[in-house]
């Protein structure tokens, strides 16, 4: 602002034609009040809107801290939960937890006021830390989708320390890639002063004449030492990276591998139905005629427990279809929730960075839409622990144990048939397959036992701990009904 503009708000009582008009000091108290009013008028949101946004962000952050904290605690406190799949879930929960903690102080509060309240270090830190955690979260979800597909298809056991170490290495690689993607935020974001009144002579409260400047410190992509075109190119590059790795790549991976997994499960459900087809009906006339000759032998063969009835076959087929439909719905929810939560933020950020919304009449509206889209995308840190943790039965058992132990201060009685099993594509592939396309479940069991088909194969028992439950076919392997019930591959 020019001196004559400031003089309209803080009149010094001197004629503009005076020789000392430019150097005559202003009243310091008047300038301070004027600057405060100007700063208040430039606040992006009204007090009512600030209360609403702050309340919603607090609810999101608290819910995310509780949900992701429970997931982390469930994996860390017991060795049986430290599997390859759970290491990836732990990595996702850790990134979401950090984002929940840093959301309000580093993302929301600086956006309320026109001035950035922190130092140069926190200007970089406040952008790099949330940015790298968002990238880590989305990349982990992508890796989990790939791992989930190959886990179910090949049934790779993941429980020992060496195999979990591979998952830890994958998680570290995800963090490194996330930091590299956030590196432009560290290099090019700086604090800069936006001055309103610079080097103005004022008289302070003690009556001394001093020189002061009034302005706001802002954290932004600065062009100091660089041409404006280069700064704009850097901004566009960061926007393209954000759209690609925060939305397009994760959504593409989720869609492709979840569709492949859904088709795989439906195909094997059909194979299972054919394998469990009811036997050929027995002719009553022949039965009656033969029973007169050899009643005891044929009666025992007809009532043999190894021959499933038509009713039990239909029941098992319906259960299989229900499990497949439930899993399909969960996979659709994973991809759909990600697409719905991140699309508004990705779209509005892309439009703002490429200056496709430059109408000054709608600046306030764009500010509110942008903040609302950010708030919607932050809901993912609450949804992720629910989709990847609470819908897993093994995690629910651990959450129940944590509740009884630390809230009710008592020990929960463990069910007799509790089952801990996990599969992961990061683990080494088992060479001793238990099932092939030419063999049925019954013949496989007979070959392994040599006497009856009710025993499980020896190789399968050595790799998986079974408490109870019948076996089911998935692809060219055998998994458990209880495993499918617990959604351990999801």
Curated annotation (Swiss-Prot):
InterPro entries: GPCR_Rhodpsn, GPCR_Rhodpsn_7TM, NPY_rcpt. Residues 292-313 have a biased composition (Low complexity). Residues 280-289 have a biased composition (Basic and acidic residues). One of its GO terms (molecular function) is neuropeptide Y receptor activity. Glycans are attached at residue 17. One of its GO terms (cellular component) is plasma membrane. The chain crosses the membrane at residues 56-76, 87-107, 126-146, 167-187, 237-257, 332-352, 375-395. It is a multi-pass membrane protein. Residues 77-86, 147-166, 258-331, 396-490 are cytoplasmic. Residues 272-322 are annotated as: Disordered. Residues 1-55, 108-125, 188-236, 353-374 are extracellular. CDD domains: 7tmA_NPYR-like. It is found in: Cell membrane. Keywords: Cell membrane, G-protein coupled receptor, Glycoprotein, Membrane, Receptor, Transducer, Transmembrane, Transmembrane helix. Not known. Putative receptor. PANTHER family: G-PROTEIN COUPLED RECEPTOR NPR-8-RELATED, NEUROPEPTIDE Y RECEPTOR. Belongs to the G-protein coupled receptor 1 family. This is Probable G-protein coupled receptor npr-8. The lineage of its organism: Eukaryota, Metazoa, Ecdysozoa, Nematoda, Chromadorea. The gene is npr-8.
